[in-house]
Amino acid sequence: MIRCIRLWSGPDGNSHFEEGVVGLQPGPRSDMLSNKFPITSVSFQETDADPKLGWHPDPARQLVITLSGALEFTTHDGRFSLRAGDILFTEDTVAGHDWNLLGEQPWRRLYAILGQATLVPFRPTAPHSAVARPESRKAETAAKTGAGL
């Protein structure tokens, strides 16, 4: 399974997160795969030193795929870490969060900007937050059924 953390701005004005995975279905050659879904644009970014951004929201609804490096995120809910291979599904465009690099390795990542209607095949595994958005249930259903991506 591919680890995925969902980060969002809640109706309470705070940032929240939950642990999960990318919903995958059996595919050819014993592979597991998700349905295809549209993205608006893709870019790469590398951060060598801790930028000390402080609390900030994300500029868009997006997937952030960590290629190398490790970091710790802080939200109003608590903290979580990302490592190479992890995916951050972020919809935190209002409340904000902070992050710090862990170790000496730069954080290399791919940003995949999503449309507002794009359903991401996120499946929660251990909800961290008691606050859940209605959209997460719709996305969870799509991930389970393989529909709507």
Regions found by a protein language model. Name each.
Residues 46-49, 57-73, 112-113:
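Short, conserved beta-strand element in jelly-roll/cupin
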